[in-house]
Amino acid sequence: MEEPRELSATEIESLRCDLETLSRELTAQLEANADAARPVKLDQTAVGRISRVEAMQGQAMAQAGQRTAKLRLDQCRNALQAIERGGYGLCRKCEEPIGVKRLRAKPEAPFCLSCQHAVDQR
């Protein structure tokens, strides 16, 4: 297991680029999927109740995807702000370094693995 350490300036700059790219991708995803998450309209040309149920299931899945994308986008924005403030890479809960491997996999991660596990258990 990786021993968490503070990030170098080069690592921070690389992760900043990753965060900016991810931010653009999530924004585009939210815009592209906005229609799918809107309320289901009754389609008189569709066949029966099954079509409406399927449409509502599709809407629920789209809404869940939108919520996840919005959360990740907020985390990206918070991480970019943390870079500006000089606190990026530190766990928001215990204030220890998050770890380079974790940040490369999920650059918007606000917590170290231990604290994330504790948050997930709630």
Residue ranges with predicted function:
Residues 89-92, 110:
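Cys/His-enriched microdomains
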Residues 93-94, 114:
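Short, cysteine/histidine-rich loop/knuckle motifs that typically chelate Zn2+
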Residues 19, 94, 103:
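Residue-level signature of catalytic and energy-coupling elements of molecular machines
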Residues 101-105, 122:
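Short Cys/His-rich "knuckle" micro-motifs
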Residues 1-85:
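Interaction interfaces in information-processing and related assembly proteins
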Residues 84-87, 105-108:
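Residue-level signal for mature regions of secreted extracellular proteins and peptides
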Residues 98, 119:
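Cys/His-rich microdomains that often coordinate metals
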Residues 109-117:
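Cysteine-rich micro-motifs
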